[in-house]
Amino acid sequence: MKEYRPQEIEKKWQEVWEEKKVFYTPQRSEKPKYYALVMFPYPSGTLHVGHVKNYVIGDIVARYKRMRGYNVLHPFGYDAFGLPAENAAIEKGIHPEEWTRKNIATIRQQVKKLGISYDWSREIATCDEEYYKWTQWIFLQLYKNGLAYKKKAAVNWCPKCKTVLANEQVKDGKCERCGTSVTIRHLEQWFFKITDYAERLLNDLDKLTGWPEHVKTMQRNWIGKSTGAEIDFPVEGSDTKIRVFTTRPDTLWGVTFMALAPESPLVEELVPEEKKEELQEFLERVKQQDRFRRTSVEAEKEGFFLGRYAINPVTGERIPIYVANYILMEYGTGAIMGVPAHDQRDFSFAKKYGIPIKVVIKPADKDLDPEKMEEAYEGEGIMVNSGPFDGTPSSEGIEKVINWLEEKGIGKRSVQYKLRDWLISRQRYWGAPIPIIYCEKCGVVPVPEEDLPVRLPKDVEFLPTGQSPLSFHEGFKKTKCPVCGGEAQRETDTMDTFVDSSWYFLRYVNPHLEDKPFEPDDVNYWLPVDQYIGGVEHAVLHLLYSRFVTKVLHDLGYLNFDEPFTNLFTQGMIYKDGAKMSKSKGNVVSPDEMIEKYGADTLRMYILFMAPPEKDAEWSDAGIEGVHRFVKRLWNTFYTVLPFVKEENTENLVLKNSTEKELRRKLHSIIKKITEDIEGGFKFNTAISGLMELVNHLSQYLNSVPQEEWNRKLLREIVEKLTLALSPFAPHLAEEFWHDLGNDSLVVQQSWPSYDPKALEVEEVEIAIQINGKVRDKVVVPVDISEEDLKRIVLERERVKEYVDGKPIRKFIYVKGRIVNIVV
């Protein structure tokens, strides 16, 4: 028998696929289109099996859809700009581009070894000039349409990465990438006006029926829509007004203090001269605190009384103005009305600073005494101490108070979003340069489209100074104004790498087009992506930004669709020793080592067999060994059968007995089940179980029936359908089997195996015979037998007679197709 040598077989078939351009995708076809896409990787080094999981999932989908008659687009590329490349330059003295290209070459080789069906002619890297030229073009489209702007802003600053971070890149007050505590700086920065799209980004989530609900919930929470009122509180002895946004205008009568965010410009405006020094000390102390943790209910509340008062517009009362550490500029207006009786953070603050507590909402069943309250009452209730609204249920009061405020001209209805504009400036080198020029005479001038790309210079010093390395490169910085021709300077910040990945799925359509980012006809044929696959960690950032950029390009007339991804699948992680794989933990499993030891087909099947693909799974060496044993058993079974079926076909197949009928029924029912498993939610683990079950049934037949009685036509049908169903999961093995069955064509070019509904019909059924509650016998009978005939057959069986002879039968119960119950 031929020996299984996976490395030889896999290399051979990968070369055949490449040579014959099997996965090259034509732009147009008579077939329906299917765009299968896996999130592209950041090329930081080598891939581990956790990364490989989603590429394998994507490949099953692409290969299956190809066999179902679709024109499949299945491309690959690299999210190649970013901080680690620059950090490598600083630490190891290697140029970011060289480091990146080396890693890309490694990843490409790793992915090819897996036998993934990518159209390599469409490969992209976001650091290629032919790519980032169009990232810059997208920036210009946003700029021209008022969606890109520059302003001085309090920004998140990572002292270690020496760059600005978007809000989304800060987790619990720490830099998402390096874990350093984030500080605040005031810098001139570029923003994209994503807030203009907040309502559409929110509402259109309802259109995304092919997305997991938890991902949509994460986006809804991030956008964070709140409906309430904006109210102006006049500052005593001044023309200044403090505007607050509140979702609880029904509590206005309970306001006993105002609080400003430490970052609010009003703080400097309102502080009296004699308090400035003391205030500065307070602000310095607060700046050291974790900005995001300081807002939590549990965090220690700190405040500074400014010595100024505001007037409550509904009661006319004087209320003290504080600066408070738990207020952030990011939310609402950066100022709040303090209602200690009905907000826990305000309650803690008021208790600490001796501020009065005034109850204005009481539960229906009891009164509240402010002196005895140990925590705020935040529930619904009846409005009290609230002037004209006394006795109003608070649930109705919100709407009534807003209407009243508008009538009186004190406030107005308002919708606010937690979402903030997307900060895209980065003070780093390895990113797409922002295509803007500054001219003393003409001001801010966009680079003309015909002058794109603004190229990154190669000869740059990578000192982590907190300024972009480009700001020290005179050759890059100095330029001519495209309007007046005078001396000018380039913008030296580069774009957030999330800008690069916000449109890459559009570029795969025409990856090497020189005069535009994509052909409108092609992009509107292929997009939206039919199936997008990637980690849930990108639920907010990448997916939200991609939706935003797609909507902008749609509104500007470049796209016919305004949502980029029809279906989204988020795969689970692979853990080792109970933890996420990482080099620092030393628990990384290398796909290269697994392929060397077991072959890519075993690795692919094990990754899919471990657990449902959306679930996290623990890597097990014993588990991959078990799958490898199955693969070898499959190989041996196939080559045992091959000599008997190689010259055979399946025409005029005759089934001679019930064993053959049952075997063929199992074949077709398993093919049906595997098809349903793939179609109905990517149940790849149970699909592979189906393949294993089929091999078991085949082995049982071969072992129990003499060779000379084997039904060769039936065996030919089984190994053919088995090979076809195997091919998305273990494509190299399937190609070898298909070739050795005498086919000149490739298995990847075949249709998915069909099942015969007639073969699924059961002609005979095994019935258990239970006497007084215990199974005593079994009988095989025609499936449509009448109860009368069945009773006669059962009572004539010797084994049954032993228990019932001479005894009156009280009951004879038949559960159709399953069991007979006799009570004597």
UniProtKB/Swiss-Prot annotation:
Its main location: cytoplasm. Belongs to the class-I aminoacyl-tRNA synthetase family. It comes from Thermotoga maritima (strain ATCC 43589 / DSM 3109 / JCM 10099 / NBRC 100826 / MSB8). It catalyses: tRNA(Leu) + L-leucine + ATP = L-leucyl-tRNA(Leu) + AMP + diphosphate. ATP binds at K583. PROSITE patterns: AA_TRNA_LIGASE_I. Keywords: Aminoacyl-tRNA synthetase, ATP-binding, Cytoplasm, Ligase, Nucleotide-binding, Protein biosynthesis. GO terms for molecular function: aminoacyl-tRNA deacylase activity; ATP binding; leucine-tRNA ligase activity. This is Leucine--tRNA ligase. A motif ('KMSKS' region) lies at residues 580-584. One of its GO terms (biological process) is leucyl-tRNA aminoacylation. The gene is leuS. One of its GO terms (cellular component) is cytosol. Its EC number is 6.1.1.4.
